[in-house]
């Protein structure tokens, strides 16, 4: 049957049913109990994320399709992150496009209007032509769907590593807006509701949930990839928002198709579905395939009988299929029948409660012997600053319509965080962060670090983080070293979110990100954080003769850094000191509101050198004295490329104010240099380094490699 269930799971369900499931029931169980849908290897740990916060309307403990947070004035934002990693490795265009479609439907399932998308893409070495092809088509897929459906892509991440040569990661996050008294659940609480399905069911995406719950085999898996139809998606979006007041619950048909959607929506009650009433894209489909098909652009609604006609009439105006396919029952049994014959009859609770797994762990935290870095400064600067991770992503953003709906306040790439306007007049900042290199060194510190980095990034535009979602992407959880990094990353994320009092209201776990030889990707947890601008918004600008202030203390912590990755420098991973991140962020927000700074950049990938380079690409030069850097090392390379957390580069005309404000908060700050008009020149301790070639690479790299690829 090609099932992905373990023998112990098959024995478990036999005991619960006291019989052997039939072949179709096995396929339903395989989908509902898949790692992708059930979180059977992770759910016990995810519960540690729950934070009771008065502004959380719908959080992780509610286990719904998206989280919702009160933002005041009767409004709420809805936030979700998802991925389409496996499909994008096989069919990058449709894999990425359907990822966008799926996340949008998760948002509208809450009755919310999507207002922003973010894409976080990780691919392999661009010297390999396949990776160029993958990236080009991933970007095209995201653009095709987002642009067609009218939701702006306002920011994201793009990075490169050999670990993703066979396993690209394609994450998409979405934000929606809704009146908080209009939020819709994805589950029901009473029987008698009619199940209404919008959309045609086809043979694409068969076994997609199971496909996403195992490693890529290298065999022909194209049938598990769904096909995107953004114009149908636009109809689903518009009509769902139109009829939201007429339905009791809304559920996107994603992984596992109707098998999962019906089971989860029933929420411990039961359901009867008549397969012959389901509108089909392909004639004479196998009933079992109909149940688990993951055809896109479909939604399931639980509707009072009196409202069914009005709901379907709204779809009929667009000539979009809509049909009553069943109903919610009080008997806790999920039934799929075909012309009156039961093909599936399984207890709801048995489906919703798969066996939970705690796999063995093996400590893989590295003990590294520190050595002094002995690298030539000039070539090190050129090599690190030329890395693809640090180049402009303008070519990517130019493929997206990021100004549709006119809610985008900060153009992608112009700041550390995206900013969109809300109906209540407030500004919402959004940022995504991950750090797989650090996670490879110390997953616990990485978990803390990505939360802290997202928090700092929001501070650079004047916002304070208030809510987050996470996406945890790892290899096979049954491998002790993989499961260890997963558990440690969760421990770090949980500690940091509790420290900042930021509730995680949802997320996703993606295991089995491995190639056909079983080699896992680097552990890649991701945080998407949102927060309201606290007063004034900072749009970075560079002015001649501005002072360069380094906020925070620099440490010889090069493990997991870009320098360490390129030059194989042995060093300890940075210890994330959350108090320093919090206090330095507060200084930045205060300085923005007092209009004391014109530019703020958190120090992360590439260290201080990369942050200074971010000033230079605005058409200026920068001169600094490394003797002014407050640090535990006098090694210039270590000071320039350390990725210690809790630090910012600030441009100001009142440097003493910044230093004094920092001192009052209990953190350090130092005036390390000035901006000048020596275009593309970085001056370090009175020595000039001409970065014209690096600046040219910064602006043109992606277009030359991908646009002409």
UniProtKB/Swiss-Prot annotation:
<dbReference type="GO" id="GO:0006189">
    <property type="term" value="P:'de novo' IMP biosynthetic process"/>
</dbReference>
<protein>
    <recommendedName>
        <fullName>Phosphoribosylformylglycinamidine synthase subunit PurL</fullName>
        <ecNumber>6.3.5.3</ecNumber>
    </recommendedName>
</protein>
<keyword id="KW-0479">Metal-binding</keyword>
<feature type="binding site">
    <location>
        <position position="82"/>
    </location>
    <ligand>
        <name>Mg(2+) 1</name>
    </ligand>
</feature>
<feature type="binding site">
    <location>
        <position position="106"/>
    </location>
    <ligand>
        <name>Mg(2+) 2</name>
    </ligand>
</feature>
<keyword id="KW-0067">ATP-binding</keyword>
<dbReference type="InterPro" id="IPR010074">
    <property type="entry name" value="PRibForGlyAmidine_synth_PurL"/>
</dbReference>
<dbReference type="GO" id="GO:0004642">
    <property type="term" value="F:phosphoribosylformylglycinamidine synthase activity"/>
</dbReference>
<dbReference type="InterPro" id="IPR036921">
    <property type="entry name" value="PurM-like_N_sf"/>
</dbReference>
<comment type="subunit">
    <text>Monomer. Part of the FGAM synthase complex composed of 1 PurL, 1 PurQ and 2 PurS subunits.</text>
</comment>
<feature type="binding site">
    <location>
        <position position="80"/>
    </location>
    <ligand>
        <name>ATP</name>
    </ligand>
</feature>
<dbReference type="Pfam" id="PF00586">
    <property type="entry name" value="AIRS"/>
</dbReference>
<dbReference type="GO" id="GO:0005737">
    <property type="term" value="C:cytoplasm"/>
</dbReference>
<feature type="binding site">
    <location>
        <position position="105"/>
    </location>
    <ligand>
        <name>substrate</name>
    </ligand>
</feature>
<dbReference type="GO" id="GO:0000287">
    <property type="term" value="F:magnesium ion binding"/>
</dbReference>
<feature type="binding site">
    <location>
        <begin position="294"/>
        <end position="296"/>
    </location>
    <ligand>
        <name>substrate</name>
    </ligand>
</feature>
<comment type="function">
    <text>Part of the phosphoribosylformylglycinamidine synthase complex involved in the purines biosynthetic pathway. Catalyzes the ATP-dependent conversion of formylglycinamide ribonucleotide (FGAR) and glutamine to yield formylglycinamidine ribonucleotide (FGAM) and glutamate. The FGAM synthase complex is composed of three subunits. PurQ produces an ammonia molecule by converting glutamine to glutamate. PurL transfers the ammonia molecule to FGAR to form FGAM in an ATP-dependent manner.</text>
</comment>
<dbReference type="InterPro" id="IPR041609">
    <property type="entry name" value="PurL_linker"/>
</dbReference>
<keyword id="KW-0460">Magnesium</keyword>
<dbReference type="GO" id="GO:0005524">
    <property type="term" value="F:ATP binding"/>
</dbReference>
<feature type="binding site">
    <location>
        <begin position="83"/>
        <end position="86"/>
    </location>
    <ligand>
        <name>substrate</name>
    </ligand>
</feature>
<dbReference type="Pfam" id="PF18072">
    <property type="entry name" value="FGAR-AT_linker"/>
</dbReference>
<feature type="active site">
    <location>
        <position position="36"/>
    </location>
</feature>
<keyword id="KW-0658">Purine biosynthesis</keyword>
<dbReference type="InterPro" id="IPR016188">
    <property type="entry name" value="PurM-like_N"/>
</dbReference>
<feature type="binding site">
    <location>
        <position position="470"/>
    </location>
    <ligand>
        <name>ATP</name>
    </ligand>
</feature>
<feature type="active site" description="Proton acceptor">
    <location>
        <position position="84"/>
    </location>
</feature>
<comment type="pathway">
    <text>Purine metabolism; IMP biosynthesis via de novo pathway; 5-amino-1-(5-phospho-D-ribosyl)imidazole from N(2)-formyl-N(1)-(5-phospho-D-ribosyl)glycinamide: step 1/2.</text>
</comment>
<feature type="binding site">
    <location>
        <position position="39"/>
    </location>
    <ligand>
        <name>ATP</name>
    </ligand>
</feature>
<keyword id="KW-0547">Nucleotide-binding</keyword>
<feature type="binding site">
    <location>
        <position position="510"/>
    </location>
    <ligand>
        <name>substrate</name>
    </ligand>
</feature>
<dbReference type="Pfam" id="PF02769">
    <property type="entry name" value="AIRS_C"/>
</dbReference>
<feature type="binding site">
    <location>
        <position position="226"/>
    </location>
    <ligand>
        <name>substrate</name>
    </ligand>
</feature>
<feature type="binding site">
    <location>
        <position position="507"/>
    </location>
    <ligand>
        <name>ATP</name>
    </ligand>
</feature>
<dbReference type="InterPro" id="IPR036676">
    <property type="entry name" value="PurM-like_C_sf"/>
</dbReference>
<keyword id="KW-0963">Cytoplasm</keyword>
<dbReference type="InterPro" id="IPR010918">
    <property type="entry name" value="PurM-like_C_dom"/>
</dbReference>
<keyword id="KW-0436">Ligase</keyword>
<comment type="similarity">
    <text>Belongs to the FGAMS family.</text>
</comment>
<feature type="binding site">
    <location>
        <position position="252"/>
    </location>
    <ligand>
        <name>Mg(2+) 2</name>
    </ligand>
</feature>
């Amino acid at each position: 049957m090609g099932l992905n269930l373990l023998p112990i799971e098959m024995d478990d369900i036999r005991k619960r049913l006291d019989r052997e499931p039939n072949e179709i029931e096995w396929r339903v169980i395989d989908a509902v109990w898949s790692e992708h849908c059930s979180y059977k290897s992770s759910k016990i740990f995810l519960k540690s994320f729950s934070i009771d916060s008065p502004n959380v309307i719908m959080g992780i403990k509610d286990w719904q399709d998206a989280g919702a947070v009160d933002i005041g004035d009767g409004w709420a934002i809805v936030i979700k992150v998802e991925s389409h990693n496996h499909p994008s490795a096989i069919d990058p265009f449709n894999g990425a496009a359907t990822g966008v479609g799926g996340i949008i439907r998760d948002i509208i399932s809450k009755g919310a209007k999507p207002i922003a998308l973010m894409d976080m893409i990780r691919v392999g070495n661009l010297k390999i032509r396949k990776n160029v092809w993958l990236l080009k088509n991933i970007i095209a897929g995201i653009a095709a769907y987002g642009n067609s459906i009218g939701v702006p892509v306002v920011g994201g991440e793009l990075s490169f590593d050999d670990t993703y040569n066979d396993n690209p990661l394609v994450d998409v996050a979405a934000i929606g807006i809704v009146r908080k008294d209009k939020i819709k659940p994805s589950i029901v609480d009473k029987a008698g509701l009619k199940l209404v399905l919008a959309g045609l069911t086809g043979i694409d995406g068969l076994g997609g949930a199971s496909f996403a719950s195992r490693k890529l085999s290298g065999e022909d898996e194209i049938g598990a990839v769904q096909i995107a139809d953004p114009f149908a998606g636009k109809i689903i979006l518009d009509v769902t928002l139109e009829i939201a007041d007429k339905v009791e619950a809304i559920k996107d048909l994603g992984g596992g198709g109707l098998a999962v959607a019906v089971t989860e929506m029933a929420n411990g009650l039961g359901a009867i579905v008549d397969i012959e009433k389901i509108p089909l894209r392909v004639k004479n489909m196998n009933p079992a395939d109909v149940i688990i098909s993951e055809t896109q652009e479909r939604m399931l609604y639980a509707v009072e009988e009196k409202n069914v006609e009005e709901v379907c009439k709204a779809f009929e105006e667009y000539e979009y299929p809509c049909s009553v396919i069943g109903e919610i029952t009080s008997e806790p049994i999920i039934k799929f029948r075909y012309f009156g014959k039961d093909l599936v009859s399984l207890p709801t609770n048995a489906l919703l409660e798969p066996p939970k797994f705690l796999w063995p762990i093996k400590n893989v935290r590295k003990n590294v012997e520190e050595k002094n870095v002995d690298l030539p400064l000039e070539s090190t600067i050129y090599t690190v600053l030329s890395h693809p991770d640090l180049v402009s992503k303008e070519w990517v953003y130019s493929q997206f319509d990021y100004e549709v709906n006119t809610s985008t306040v900060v153009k992608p790439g112009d700041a550390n965080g995206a900013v969109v306007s809300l109906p209540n007049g407030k500004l919402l900042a959004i940022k995504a962060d991950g750090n797989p290199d650090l996670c490879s060194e110390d997953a616990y510190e990485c978990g803390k670090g990505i939360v802290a980095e997202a928090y700092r990034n929001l501070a650079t535009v004047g916002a304070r983080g208030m809510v987050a979602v996470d996406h945890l992407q790892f290899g096979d959880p049954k491998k002790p070293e993989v499961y260890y990094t997963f558990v440690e990353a969760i421990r770090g994320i949980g500690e940091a979110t509790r420290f900042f009092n930021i509730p995680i209201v949802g997320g996703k776990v993606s295991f089995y990100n491995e190639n056909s030889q079983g080699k896992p990707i680097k552990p890649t947890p991701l945080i998407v954080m949102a927060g309201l601008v606290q007063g004034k918004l900072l749009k970075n600008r560079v002015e001649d003769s501005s002072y360069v202030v380094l906020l925070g203390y620099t440490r010889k912590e090069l493990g997991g850094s870009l320098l360490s990755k390129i030059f194989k420098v042995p060093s300890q991973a940075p210890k994330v000191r959350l108090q320093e991140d919090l206090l330095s962020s507060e200084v930045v927000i205060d300085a923005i509101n007092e209009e004391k700074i014109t530019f703020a950049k958190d120090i992360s990938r590439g260290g201080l050198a990369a942050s200074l380079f971010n000033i230079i690409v605005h058409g200026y030069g920068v001169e600094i004295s490394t003797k002014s850097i407050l640090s535990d090392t006098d090694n210039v390379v270590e000071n320039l490329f350390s990725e210690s957390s809790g630090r910012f580069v600030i441009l100001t005309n009142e440097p003493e104010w910044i230093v004094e404000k920092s001192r009052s908060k209990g953190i350090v700050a130092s005036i390390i240099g000035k901006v000048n008009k020596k275009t593309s020149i970085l001056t370090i301790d009175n020595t000039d380094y001409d970065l014209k070639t690096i600046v040219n690479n910064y602006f043109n790299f992606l277009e030359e490699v991908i646009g002409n690829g």
